[in-house]
Each structure stands twice: as C-alpha cells, then as structure tokens.
Amino acid sequence: FFKIVKILILFLLLAFVGAGFYAGNIAYETLLTAPWEKILGVTKHRADLSRMHSREEKDGWQPVEIRSADGTKLHGTYIESSRESPYTVILLHGLYQNRSMSMPYADMYRDMGYNVLLIDQRGHGESGGSHTTWGLRETDDLDAWTEWLREKDGGVKIGMHGVSLGAAMALIYSGTEKGKEISFYVADSAYGGMMELGK
C-alpha cells in the first residue's frame, strides 16, 4: 500500500513541476512577444493624437516619420522656434503615453527659444513596435532621431528631456558613444531600477 502511495505522490509531484514549467514558458513567451495592450489592457498610449494633429495643421508644426536601425517606423513632431536658434530639445514621454503628453514641456522650451522635437517612443503613439524594449532598441531610435536633426541642421546643439520611462531612456542613452554628444539631459522622475515599475 505504501509503495503505491509513494508512486502516486511522486507522479503528482512530477505532474505539478511539469505543469509549472509549461505555464512559466507560456508566460515568458507572452511577455516577450505580446503587445502591452494584450497583457495589461492598456490602450491609452495608442489613443487620441487629434490634439497634436490639429496643432500641426494650425501652427505649421512638422510631422516627422523616420526609420530606426531595425526598420521600425518612428513618428514625431518638429516645432521650430519663433526666433532663430541652434538649440533643439528632444522630448521623451513616459510609459503608456504618447508625444501629445509632452506638449506642456514643448511650450516651456519654445518660450525659452528652443526648437522642439516631440517623439512617440517605439510601441507608443503612432510609432511602430508592439512594446518597449527597456532601452535595448530605444538607443538606436534616439540615434536615428539625433541623426535626423543633424541632417536638418548641421550645427544643431541637442538636449534631451525625458519623463519617467523617457527619463530612463535619456539616462541610458547618455552612456552611449553618440549620447555623449548631447549638450544636456533632463531626467524627470526616472526610476532607479526595474523593480520600481511593479510598485
């Protein structure tokens, strides 16, 4: 009798461990490949950009579309200062947001005489990609944006202002070779580590 019970317990234990590995593998694959909207039910960051589009039309702001190194389409809006300026600041929004959330900062920088580039980070707004890569591909994206600015104006001096996820991306970029060419960084409410995102 005890031999049968031991075999049954061993079988149940192996089945439980096997089911755990299977479920863990499914969760891992989902987190790597599924869009954030599917995982978290969040769609706001893909939502309404009509206010941005109306300002583009009304105020003559320039909609911009470029491609990152991996071919991902990236969208942004370039706003020229009312007075001639060699300075342009790139505004990086937070997680689950889009470039329209950076508009108050755009107004602030324009009042100080800066040109402004508001961007949708990958997986957000109108930019391609299903989710953020937490800096893995975003540094390539920022390379592409800074290159676009330098092609537009060879003498441009670039600053970068990020909020939350955008601040973290700015800090990550500051450690890259091309990131050292940026004139200044503003990191507003950056998180110190990935664990803080779960709080």
Q: Residues of each region from the PLM?
A:
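Hydrolase active-site cap/lid region
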Residues: 172-199
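An N-terminal hydrophobic leader/cap segment in hydrolases
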Residues: 11-67
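The serine-hydrolase catalytic nucleophile loop
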Residues: 95-108, 121
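Conserved alpha/beta-hydrolase
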Residues: 108-128
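A short loop-to-beta-strand scaffold at the N-terminal edge of the catalytic core in hydrolase folds
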Residues: 69-80
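Alpha/beta-hydrolase active-site loop
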Residues: 132-153
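Alpha/beta-hydrolase fold nucleophile elbow
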Residues: 153-164
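Short beta-strand element of the alpha/beta-hydrolase
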Residues: 86-94
